[in-house]
């Protein structure tokens, strides 16, 4: 270290706004805030309050202004940047439109998402996060096999590269198509950015520091290509109204960028790009004008209310729609046509009621006087607090509910061709009992008994063939044993709705006494009804005006071929009476009922095994799954989990359960991504209407950050 004078040394700092490098004489015990104060020219009338020191070589912000240079580790050979904390980020919304937004690059990613959602009028921002856009190359190899790119940083003498911290997601995109730090976002001759399809507006010069939060008179102006820019002349109302309605289809170049997985392996590799919520986005290789995707990350949506969540519901509907069109989820043919019909109804209602005319929410109470408004508000409050069935007569609460009927049963066995056998089923207290006859159920012991608590439930329904089957993967009675597979077949849809609802509740550890049983039955009936052949005449529409590729996945397009439009219009007759908001809500509910909904996949290797397997992470459990078939080998519930932690040195994760410990390494993503998913879902489970308080950001980071 070269010292100049008494315990002083030279520190080089680049003021990025002015592109001027200054050399200050400092001491090691000088505070960071004092260094910034010495940088500012008092004669220059500029607001520097949004600026902070960034250390490119270490890839960290020096935001603790009371810390000294010695405490921060800054030495004479260090080179710092004095740069704005708020920078422009291009954000792709779930409906695939882009907006340019001023984000605090020094705040934790979680805080940046919360701030963005607040401006966009999206409640419960903890359900969303940023992820880096992917390209086809990312699906060809596991994360562990991808070239381990370091984060490029600008130094005085050129570009340097730093290794991401061990306890963060170290994924850096292979190419520079979305990342500006390697020069890929240099402006073109017409001033447009190259990080995404060029937008027709000309980018303005850098605006004064500040965010839409601090500028309540700002607006976002949209154009036909799906881009939005910030203009400080009016309010956010136009933006929120626009985000509550989405165009029918994105531009062709945006759609062409979509990455379509072709197997379970590729679906698992889709999850490599999630940002670390505990670090700032700049510390994760994201630079100004780069693109990030805003997506619903945790598939547990709290208190969806059409009255308050128009933007949230629309963006959720759009994410659901694209997950189906992009073949991330694969519904049956009947389910696909139901989704297409609901989407067609959404588009039809949007054409009938453009933004600003009708929101799709029932406002009839406004016409009937103030007393009805009060009654309506009280009823809504009661439903919110008690649930949909709260006001109904629940009967004798001391009697344990029971379900019984004749059904067919099958336990698949290797090398046998045995078919279904008829039994008299009774279900009570999470236990399924099978008898040879109803008379035997009154006096004899059951022939077969199955504990359904924590089972995996998969529907197998074909309305055209009259097939109503339920596949159950039941936890083994042997300690640490694999799941066993059994099938239950119902005679009709009414029987199926009751038993399927019971099985779904059992999977969550809930019995028939749970207040949500009736609503679960009603939801299943409603979904089946929408998949039936329509009774009424289809809407009079010119088939040539319907573009089937906007409603069907490529695989289903090939299957239906020339009959696609006709089948969509026939299915639409079932849902043609739905309002805009009802159609979106039905779509979301149907999406949530799909077998693979809400299961985030990762490729892993268990400790001591060379074989790759799938790990599924859901809102209440993690699952060991077969890589080829997707069968559930073993399920572990979060309520049996004592601790989970990561060895950051070898990127290995250990989960301590009541009966066993499991250790695995993650192949398809960084270990931090899995760690954060588990902690995030546990955080989501702590929410309740009785405890509907301010978002506890500290608790979120404690559960997801990998440190206490």
Curated annotation (Swiss-Prot):
Pfam families: FERM_M, Kindlin_2_N, PH. Residues 274-602 form the FERM domain. GO terms for molecular function: cell adhesion molecule binding; integrin binding. InterPro entries: Band_41_domain (IPR019749), FERM/acyl-CoA-bd_prot_sf (IPR014352), FERM_2 (IPR035963), FERM_central (IPR019748), Kindlin/fermitin (IPR037843), Kindlin_2_N (IPR040790), PH-like_dom_sf (IPR011993), PH_domain (IPR001849). GO terms for cellular component: cell-substrate junction; cytoplasm. It is found in: Cytoplasm. It comes from the Eukaryota. The modification Phosphothreonine is found at residue 211. Gene3D superfamilies: 1.20.80.10, Phosphatidylinositol 3-kinase Catalytic Subunit, Chain A, domain 1 (3.10.20.90), Pleckstrin-homology domain (PH domain)/Phosphotyrosine-binding domain (PTB) (2.30.29.30). Residues 400-508 form the PH domain. One of its GO terms (biological process) is cardiac muscle tissue development. The keyword Methyltransferase does not apply. Its main location: cytoplasm. Signal peptide: none annotated. Keywords: Cell adhesion, Cytoplasm, Phosphoprotein. The modification Phosphoserine is found at residues 181, 184, 199, 215, 234. The keyword Cell division does not apply. The FERM domain is not correctly detected by PROSITE or Pfam techniques because it contains the insertion of a PH domain. Belongs to the kindlin family. Probably involved in cell adhesion. This is Unc-112-related protein. The lineage of its organism: Eukaryota, Metazoa, Ecdysozoa, Arthropoda, Hexapoda.
């Amino acid at each position: 270290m070269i010292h100049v004078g008494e315990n002083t040394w030279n520190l080089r700092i680049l003021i990025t706004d002015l592109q001027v490098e200054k050399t200050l004489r400092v001491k090691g015990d000088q505070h960071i805030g004092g260094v910034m104060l010495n940088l500012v020219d008092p004669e220059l009338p500029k607001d520097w309050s949004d600026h902070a020191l960034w250390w490119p070589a270490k890839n960290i912000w020096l935001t603790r202004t009371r810390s000294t240079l010695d405490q921060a580790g800054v030495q004479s050979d260090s080179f710092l940047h004095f740069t704005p904390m708020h920078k422009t980020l291009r954000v792709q919304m779930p409906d695939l439109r882009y907006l340019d937004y001023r984000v605090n690059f020094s705040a934790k990613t979680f805080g940046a998402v919360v701030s963005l959602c607040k401006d966009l009028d999206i409640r419960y921002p903890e359900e969303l996060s940023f992820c880096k856009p992917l390209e086809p190359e990312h699906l060809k190899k596991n994360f562990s096999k991808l070239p381990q790119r370091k984060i490029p940083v600008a130094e005085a003498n050129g570009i340097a590269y730093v290794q991401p911290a061990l306890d963060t997601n170290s994924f850096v995109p292979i190419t520079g198509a979305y990342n500006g730090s390697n020069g890929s976002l240099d402006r073109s001759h017409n001033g447009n950015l190259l990080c995404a399809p060029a937008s027709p507006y000309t980018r303005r010069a850098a605006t004064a520091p500040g965010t839409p939060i601090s500028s309540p008179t700002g607006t976002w102006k949209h154009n036909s290509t799906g881009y939005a820019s910030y203009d400080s002349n009016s309010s956010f109302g136009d933006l929120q109204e626009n985000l509550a309605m989405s165009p029918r289809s994105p531009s062709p170049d945006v759609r062409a960028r979509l990455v379509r997985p072709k197997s379970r392996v590729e679906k698992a590799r889709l999850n490599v790009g999630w940002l670390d919520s505990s670090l700032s986005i700049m510390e994760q290789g994201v630079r100004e004008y780069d693109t990030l995707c805003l997506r619903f990350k945790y598939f547990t949506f709290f208190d969806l209310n059409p009255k308050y969540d128009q933007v949230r519901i629309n963006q959720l509907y759009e994410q659901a729609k694209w997950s189906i069109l992009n073949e991330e989820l694969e519904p049956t043919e009947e389910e696909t046509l139901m989704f297409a019909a609901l989407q067609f109804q959404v588009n039809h209602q949007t054409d009938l009621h453009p933004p600003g005319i009708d929101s799709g929410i029932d406002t009839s109470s406004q016409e009937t006087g103030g007393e009805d408004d009060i009654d309506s508000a009280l009823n809504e409050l009661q439903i919110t607090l008690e649930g949909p069935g709260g006001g109904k007569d629940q009967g004798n609460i001391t009697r344990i509910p029971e379900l019984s009927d004749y059904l067919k049963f099958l336990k698949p066995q290797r090398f046998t061709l045995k078919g279904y056998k008829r039994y008299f089923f009774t279900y009570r207290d999470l236990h399924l009992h099978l008898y040879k006859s109803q008379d035997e159920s009154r006096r004899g012991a059951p022939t077969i008994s199955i504990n359904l608590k924590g089972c995996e439930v998969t529907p197998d329904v074909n309305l055209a063939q009259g097939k109503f089957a339920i596949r159950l993967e039941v936890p083994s009675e042997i300690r640490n044993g694999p799941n066993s597979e059994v099938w239950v077949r119902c005679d009709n849809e009414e029987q199926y709705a009751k038993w399927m609802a019971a099985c779904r509740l059992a999977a969550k550890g809930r019995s028939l006494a749970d207040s949500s049983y009736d609503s679960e039955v009603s939801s299943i009936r409603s979904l089946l009804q929408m998949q039936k052949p329509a009774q009424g005449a289809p809407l009079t529409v010119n088939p040539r005006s319907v573009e089937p590729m906007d409603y069907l996945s490529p695989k289903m397009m090939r299957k239906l071929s020339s009959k696609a439009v006709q089948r969509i219009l026939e299915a639409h007759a079932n849902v043609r009476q739905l309002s805009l908001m009802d159609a979106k809500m039905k779509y979301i509910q149907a999406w949530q009922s799909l077998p693979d909904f809400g299961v985030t996949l990762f490729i892993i290797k268990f400790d001591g095994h060379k074989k790759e397997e799938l790990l599924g992470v859901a809102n209440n459990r993690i699952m060991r799954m077969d890589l080829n078939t997707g069968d559930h080998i073993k399920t572990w519930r979060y309520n049996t989990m004592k601790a989970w932690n990561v060895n950051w040195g070898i990127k290995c994760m250990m989960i301590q359960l009541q009966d066993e410990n499991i250790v695995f390494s993650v192949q398809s993503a960084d270990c931090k991504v899995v760690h954060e998913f588990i902690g995030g879902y546990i955080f989501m489970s702590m929410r309740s209407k009785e405890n509907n308080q301010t978002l506890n950001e500290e608790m979120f980071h404690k559960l997801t950050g990998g440190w206490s």
